[in-house]
Structure formats: structure tokens, C-alpha cells
Amino acid sequence: MTLTFSSSAATVAVAAATVTSSARVPVYPLASSTLRGLVSFRLTAKKLFLPPLRSRGGVSVRAMSELVQDKESSVAASIAFNEAAGETPSELSHSRTFLDARSEQDLLSGIKKEAEAGRLPANVAAGMEELYWNYKNAVLSSGASRADETVVSNMSVAFDRMLLGVEDPYTFNPYHKAVREPFDYYMFVHTYIRPLIDFKNSYVGNASIFSELEDKIRQGHNIVLISNHQSEADPAVISLLLEAQSPFIGENIKCVAGDRVITDPLCKPFSMGRNLICVYSKKHMNDDPELVDMKRKANTRSLKEMATMLRSGGQLIWIAPSGGRDRPNPSTGEWFPAPFDASSVDNMRRLVEHSGAPGHIYPMSLLCYDIMPPPPQVEKEIGEKRLVGFHGTGLSIAPEINFSDVTADCESPNEAKEAYSQALYKSVNEQYEILNSAIKHRRGVEASTSRVSLSQPWN
């Protein structure tokens, strides 16, 4: 339902060798750190704003209700803007079924109506209905006040964006910049995920380091976050846990993302709200032999794009070099960070080192699988079953790990590559165990150690 940043990272190993300093790809600036409303239009000097959503344990129902109510005026504004440009906006012919929904029955009957009209494929309609019930059960389990209203308002907007994506499919470029207007997809994702996070049982490890990252980025340094990957909600969890202290991080992070998040109709609206470096997953590279060459060329373009961005400096890139989401131990049921692909780590390191700008690599750990647990095994087909839950989440970062410090005694490049990857993985795993103790074993900040200090920056 939201973003799957899975096996994209392993693809770095496939294409990085082709990235050269001669690449000439447009450089995209960092997104603004200003929190905007969900809908805005550049018609005049005046913009239409909705209030930023800052609730700690729940969602602003009023803001989402206003979003639905303001869609009529947004369509009118879009018409005016596009008529001036001589264009016909997709919103003109867009069905209002979900925009007009005010109840659960309206939403469910709307899915049926759109499917019968041929505007929703049967499999997409079935996935939307399943998602509705799973999301509703998760939000209601939070015990938040007006949870029913939250579900209807959030799902009406989500369904509207999914339907629009089917009617007028969005095409992602190798580097996709988060769409912030006229519809603010970034805030849309936050509003949707926020009610699923139990902030009372969520923690950030070494929060001060994230503030240091922001300072370095503003000075033109490149930062790469090497972490595990747990769920489709990972990018939103990172942003929401840092929202009170470091909103700059959430808005400017660029995620190396697999192709499935930009093709699944239920994922695409959420993907549109993130900065993505889009690649084809190594795990799915050979699903269709006829497409292998096309996928490799596309990955080369994406890696050139990344190299160009790094040369401009001031970049924040998140990559999960395991090549996919973590899975539980089949024997014990315990979750743990999946092992890293050493080649992916090494190629990312070389891209940073050869960029010409100061660069730093930090190990980061995520614990949030209960929010949207992945299927037990990697699936070939698009359209996985999406479970949703209300749970505590965790995010932790450790100090930078320097390649030369770790590999000083290594006797070969191969040994050095493996040693560096293992050093990063060891740190991620150590942080994960501390987050697990705090959240799953309910130890809270008492789970802190000399290396990982847990806190709740939103309190």
C-alpha cells in the first residue's frame, strides 16, 4: 500500500561499474524543508493551504476532511491553471466517487461502482476493499478518539488517488522528486501512516546524530544511510519519528527504490510522495527474460543520475543493501536484519568517494515490520496481500563508520569489501536488538546502552 523499497539496493552492484564521471544528467535540488498543506496551487501569489499535521498519536481528522471538501475547489483551480496553459488536466474527467464519500458504505459501494463501470480492474478493486478493512481494524485498535472518522477521511483520499492513478497512470523518471503540488503527496503519506504508529511505544536512538546530519548536508556534504528494510512504511516511519526534531531529514531523503513501488496501483500514490532513485530489483531482474536488457539499461541511467547528484553535494541517500525486506526466522519467528550484499555496499561507498564532495556513511536501523508486514516469501507477481497494524516503531543511527579505519589490516580489496559491509551490518544489528528490547519487550528508554541512547523527540 505504501512504499516498498526492497531489492533495489542490490542492483547497485549490477550497474555501478558503468557510471562514469562523463555522465551529464540534470541535477535536482533538495526539496524545501517548509511543511506545506496538502493542496496548493501556483495560480497567483496566493496559495491554498491546509494546516500541517502534527498530532503525536493520531491524525488531524479535520485536516483530512477539509482536503476532501476542498477537492471541488482544487479541480476548479486546476482547470483555470491548465486552461491558461492550453492543457486539459486529468482531474477534469476524473470520477468524484471517492471525493464525495462520507461514510464506510459510500467507500465500499464506490469500489463496486467503479469496478462495474470498468474504471477499476477487478484485482485492484479487490485489493482496495481488503486494504480498507485491514486499515480500519488497525486504526480502531489504536483506541484513538474519532477513529472511524479518521479511517473514512484517510481512505477516501487514498482511494481517490489510486483511482486517478488507474485513469491517468503516472510515469516515474529515474530520479523522482516528491510531488508536493497541486496535491501534496508527501503530507498525504504522513497523514495516512501516522494513525498506525503507537508513539507511546516508539523510540529514536541517538537523535542528536540526525541533527548533525542536517548540518553536514547544509554544508554540502553527502550522507548515505545504510540500513535494514522492514516494511512498505519505512520512509514514512523515518520522517514521522524525526518530524518534531528534524523535518529536514524526512523531506530531503532520497530512497533507492525497487520498480514494484512504481507499478503497483495501490503503491503508486504513496511513492509519488517520496524522493526516489528508481531501479529494477536484482531479485526480479530475470522474471521476464525479454526485459532483462531494458532493466539493466534503466538501472545504468538511474546510477548515472545518482552519481551526478552526489557530485553536486548536499545529498542524503538511503539504501538497504540486503536487497529486500527483512523476514522472520522460519524456525523461531523472530525478526532480524537481513544480511547485506557486500557488493552493493562497496559500490555505494565508491560512488560517494568519487563524487568530489565530502561524504559520510552511517549505519541506521529500523524496527517497524508490524505496521505493514511483508509476505513470508518474496513474491514474483505484483499486488501482494497488504496487512496493516497499529504498533510501536523504532529508528536508530550510529556514528559514521570510516572505510579506512575498518580495513586497515585487510590484505585484499575483496577482504576489505567484506569487512566494511560486516562492520555496517554489525552496527545495524546491534541497534536493532536495542530497539527490539525497548519496543517488543517494553523496556522503553531503559533499553539504552552506552552506544545507543533512546528518546522520544516528539515529547
Swiss-Prot record:
Protein name from the UniProt record: Glycerol-3-phosphate acyltransferase, chloroplastic
Keywords, ordered alphabetically: Acyltransferase, Chloroplast, Lipid biosynthesis, Lipid metabolism, Phospholipid biosynthesis, Phospholipid metabolism, Plastid, Transferase, Transit peptide
Domain remark from Swiss-Prot or TrEMBL: The HXXXXD motif is essential for acyltransferase activity and may constitute the binding site for the phosphate moiety of the glycerol-3-phosphate.
Domain of life where this protein originates: Eukaryota
Presequence boundaries: 1-90
The reaction(s) this protein catalyses: sn-glycerol 3-phosphate + an acyl-CoA = a 1-acyl-sn-glycero-3-phosphate + CoA
InterPro entries: G3P_O-acylTrfase_chlp (IPR016222), G3P_O-acylTrfase_N (IPR023083), GPAT_N_sf (IPR038114), Plipid/glycerol_acylTrfase (IPR002123)
Source organism (scientific name): Arabidopsis thaliana (Mouse-ear cress)
Similarity remark: Belongs to the GPAT/DAPAT family.
Keyword Cytoplasm: no
EC number(s) on file: 2.3.1.15
Motif placement: HXXXXD motif: 229-234
